Amino acid sequence: YSERRFEPVIFTFFLFFQIHYFQRAFIFPLLLKGKSKMPLAIMSMGVLFNLLNGYMQGKWIFYLAPETMYQAGWFTSPWFIIGTLLFFAGMLLNWQSDYIIRHLRKPGDTRHYLPQKGMYRYVTSANYFGEILEWAGWAILTCSLSGLVFLWWTIANLVPRANAIWCRYREEFGDAVGERKRVFPFLY
């Protein structure tokens, strides 16, 4: 165990990370309505990614970051304030977007619907935008290369998926998609 684990700033980073993953690992699955199964290969890749990423984030925060970097003054730094605002804005956007998707269908309905509420008015993958915003906030609030790498991995994973969703929506719903972008409002 790191001797730094209870330093206030580092402990705060740890709590932020744990809030995200507690919700994603324990709460989110309980909220899902469908009975579809996830392929073992996809699940295994997710587990591997999270093990590697968790190791990388923890190694930086608890061991490699300079001991003078995350002192109490960090809480009032622009990095921490802006990063925290983005992190939680992204988290809440992600949760709201997931809620909207989960409530598109009534029980027994199997049709696809185009989400119309929240950030879905601007992009077809609002949940992905929230996730990207969240990890951009993480990269800023930790001001770390490991946070930046995590953000890059998130973008590299979610932007192509957002493009596939946008193309599928265009094919299925045509002009109803309107001017919505894929994942970044007003941009892409």
Task: Label the model's feature ranges.
Residues 25-30, 55-56, 161-168:
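Juxtamembrane membrane-interface segments at transmembrane alpha-helix termini
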Residues 1-49, 188:
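Membrane-helix and juxtamembrane interface regions of eukaryotic multi-pass membrane proteins
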Residues 35-36, 62, 137, 143:
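Hydrophobic alpha-helical membrane context
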Residues 56-60, 94-97:
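C-terminal TM-helix exit segments that contain a strictly Trp-centered aromatic cap at the helix terminus
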Residues 30-58, 65-69, 109-113:
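Functional transmembrane or membrane-interface alpha-helices that line membrane-embedded catalytic
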Residues 1-6, 49, 68-188:
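Hydrophobic transmembrane alpha-helices
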